[in-house]
Each structure stands twice: as structure tokens, then as C-alpha cells.
Amino acid sequence: MTTLIVGGSSGLGLALAKEFADAGDKVIVTGRKKPDADFVKFEKLDLSVSPAPMIAKLVESLPNIDRLVYSAGFYQDGLVTDLSNEQIDQMINVAGTGLIYFMRELLNKQGKLKQLITITSTSQWTPRRLEPIYNFAKAGIGHFSNAMAEDGRVEKVLVVGPSGMRTKFWDGVARDDLDKMLDKAWVAEQVLKSLPGDYKYKFIRILRQPARVEEADIR
């Protein structure tokens, strides 16, 4: 299979790329910086500003994609009144509307997609005072992906809501619980274990203390 991982140049996205490459997939990753990894093909892509034209151009240049993994995220904490227009747009573009444009372009080009894997967060279902825009974006892509499972052109959808992981995502963010966060390689393994099966839609939560996987919905 050919797997495209958006936000795959670091963190969980790169850990997933390693898992899929080891399983024999041809893996293409997007990101802002090229990863030090010889098992992927890298496509530079910055989703933070006006992503639609860049996504259309990229998809047109790619081979047919069997599996889309959307693992892109951008985080800024603060009350809604604390955040600038630019910060709000960046979070929504990267963590939200980028997925919409990728799905539109892939389905327009290919007519179908075998698998969609969407990485959200516990912020998909847990409201947090200092994460209103992040809550909005993660809940939005979770429900959008659920709707994609109702589109007959998409064969299988897996939505994954993990707790925080020890990645560069938290660089520059003051946290006192980094030592309690999940290991990204372990999370990637759980995603691959949850992928097989006869379903159209599955939603799993990957939680910590203790580290575990909960199946929240399946049909």
C-alpha cells in the first residue's frame, strides 16, 4: 500500500511512518522539516497559512494514495480572548481544515480511499479552559472523519484519540507532567494493532496511568 502521513516528519507521525514502512508500505510524509529517516519520501508542506492551493498541488503530484494518516497538529494555549487572528487561523488550518482539503483533493483525483486514520487528542472530547481553539479543531476532525465513514468512497476510518505523548509537540510549552506522558512508539504500535477488522468506522482512545486502549465506538 501507499501511505501518506500528513504531519509525519516527527513525533507520532514519524513513529507511524516507521511502523507502516516496516510492514512493507511505500510511505510519504509531509512536514516543515525533512526527517532524518531513510524509510520515507518527504514532501515539504506548511499548512499554517492558506493550505488549500498547496494541498491541491501536492495531491496532483503524488501517486494514488491507499491510506491517508492525518497526524498534523499545532498548539497554542490561552483563553479565546488571548489568541490573535493568526494563532487561531494556524491552529484551525493545521489541526482541522487541512484534513478537509486533503480528503477533497484525494477523492476528486482517485474517486476512492481505502483507509483514513485521523489522530485527534483527548481534547476531542475533554473541554479545557485554555484550549478552546484546539478543542474546536480536534473535535471537528474527529466528527468530520466519522462523517467520511458514511461516504461510500472511503472504505475504512479509524479515529485515534491519544493522551499526551513525549514529543517535540510540547517544545516551548510549560508542562509538569512530561514524565507521565505516553511513548510515541508504543502509541504507534497500538494504532496498527487496532487497524485490522471488519468495520467502516472505529474510534479508539489511547490513555495513560495506566497506559491502555479503549474502544469507544465501532460500526
Model-identified regions with their sequence ranges:
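Hydrophobic positions on the long internal alpha-helix
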Residues: 69, 98-106, 110, 144-145
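C-terminal helical subdomain
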Residues: 155, 159-160, 175-219
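N-terminal Rossmann NAD(P)H-binding glycine-rich loop of SDR-like oxidoreductase domains
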Residues: 9-18
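Conserved glycine-rich Rossmann-like NAD(P)H-binding loop of the short-chain dehydrogenase/reductase
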Residues: 23-38
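Catalytic Tyr-X3-Lys loop
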Residues: 74, 81-101, 141
